[in-house]
């Protein structure tokens, strides 16, 4: 998981 723009996916 990672948070590109502030949303974790």
Curated annotation (Swiss-Prot):
Disulfide bond listed as a keyword: yes
Keywords per UniProt: Disulfide bond
SS bond list: 3-8
Function: Causes stimulation of sperm respiration and motility through intracellular alkalinization, transient elevations of cAMP, cGMP and calcium levels in sperm cells, and transient activation and subsequent inactivation of the membrane form of guanylate cyclase.
Stated name of the protein: Sperm-activating peptide
Organism (species): Stomopneutes variolaris
């Amino acid at each position: 998981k990672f948070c590109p723009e502030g949303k974790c996916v």
